[in-house]
Regions:
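Well-ordered beta-sheet/strand-loop patches within structured domains
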Residues: 18-65, 143, 150-151, 155, ...
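C-terminal motif of bacterial Sec signal peptides marking the signal peptidase cleavage site
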Residues: 13-16
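Conserved catalytic/binding loops enriched for acidic/polar residues
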Residues: 179, 184, 207
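Sec-dependent signal peptide recognition
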Residues: 2-8
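Alpha-helix capping and helix-coil boundary motifs
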Residues: 9, 130-137, 174-181, 190-191
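Cationic-aromatic interfacial patches
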Residues: 18-170
Length: 344
């Protein structure tokens, strides 16, 4: 009985010793990098509740909170991004890309630029007095890295908005990042490669970036019509079309022009007719029209739809007849009201 009791006590003593606790990878990486034994005290049992509480609190501001939460749940809530990318300097590269996003028309603060720089500096200084300070710093830096990486690659690679949710008559099925794509970015083994992959490289985009820099230097004011117009067009160029082709016919609706491109060459350029902006009170008038059914209440909407399609054939100088829908809903009704409408 005494031997059995001694064996149980001995087992409990051995299990409770730090000597036999498995050291987390983050402890090994940071202790070696900074030559500081403090990081060897890193205890995941203490760190995990701190990280989970911060994740729950900060995820409300994430672009894709469910995706990031699932990523950490799969990785046992460990600081995977810091472990993989801090020592190699790739987190500093991420900070640099975020700072340079101003050249693409973004405000770097939408990516928490200032806070991220301070968090990196705190770890770089390596002046923690207790391991508890390390837990707080690692948790904040890890979560901000995930937030920035997810948001930056989405915004730079696909645009900051989905135009189909923004424009009234936008029928282009622009490519958008799905959960598999975003998860692959968080699980990457080469963070810098992911950042480079989402940079727009087409010539018009590069030329617009140069124009933005020139206007900023010459005007010295960020909030001008010229600067804002360039920013909006940079955003439009980040929207990914469903198909990339060597030849492209582009209708510039505000400019009333059509241009036929073949790669960087212009094959044709001409003026075209486009629709006008719909009435300012369109929504209210449409509600009234749906109730009354009277054509007098129907609001005018002649906006040119934004669409993308592939030409199978082109007919030059076609015979154009008034579409039946226009004849019924507009011309017939106006002719009944005004006997001289057609002659005028």
């Amino acid at each position: 009985m005494r031997k059995a009791l001694l064996f149980v006590v001995l087992c409990m003593f051995i299990t409770g010793c730090d000597w036999f606790r498995e050291k987390p990878e983050i402890a090994t990486v940071l202790a070696k990098h900074f030559d500081n034994k403090l990081y060897n005290k890193f205890d995941t049992a203490i760190y995990l509740p701190i990280f989970k509480a911060k994740l729950e609190d900060q995820s409300k501001g994430f672009l894709n909170p469910k995706l990031i939460s699932a990523f950490y749940a799969k990785n046992e809530y460990l600081p995977k991004l810091i472990t993989k990318f801090y020592v190699t300097g790739q987190l500093d590269t991420l900070k640099s890309f975020v700072a340079q996003s101003k050249a693409d028309g973004f405000n770097p603060e939408i990516f928490n630029a200032t806070a991220y720089e301070k968090q990196l500096q705190a770890l770089n200084r390596n002046q923690f007095k207790t391991i508890d300070e390390v837990y707080e710093a690692i948790a904040d830096l890890e979560l901000n890295t995930a937030y920035i990486l997810n948001k930056y690659t989405n915004f730079m690679g696909y645009g900051s908005i989905n135009p189909r949710n923004f424009f009234n008559r936008f029928y282009i099925k622009v490519l958008r990042p799905d959960s598999l794509k975003m998860d692959s970015v968080l699980n990457t083994e080469n963070l810098v490669a992911e950042l480079k992959k989402v940079q727009p490289t087409n010539r018009p985009y590069i030329e617009l970036k140069k124009a933005l820099a020139n206007y900023r230097d010459s005007i010295g004011n960020e909030e001008t019509p010229q600067v804002n117009a360039i920013k909006m067009n940079l955003e439009r160029m980040r929207w990914r079309l469903p198909l990339q082709t060597e030849e492209l016919v582009v209708v510039n609706i505000p400019d009333f022009t059509l241009t036929w491109f073949k790669q960087d060459d212009t094959l044709a350029h001409m003026n075209v007719c486009v629709g006008g902006k719909r009435e300012a009170t369109y929504v209210q008038k449409m509600k009234r029209y749906l109730k009354t059914g009277r054509l007098d209440d129907k609001p005018k909407n002649h906006e040119t739809p934004q669409l993308f399609s592939v030409f199978n054939a082109i007919q030059v100088n076609p015979i154009w007849n008034i579409p039946v829908s226009i004849a019924k809903s507009e011309i017939y009704w106006m002719a009944r009201k005004d006997p001289y409408y057609l002659s005028n």
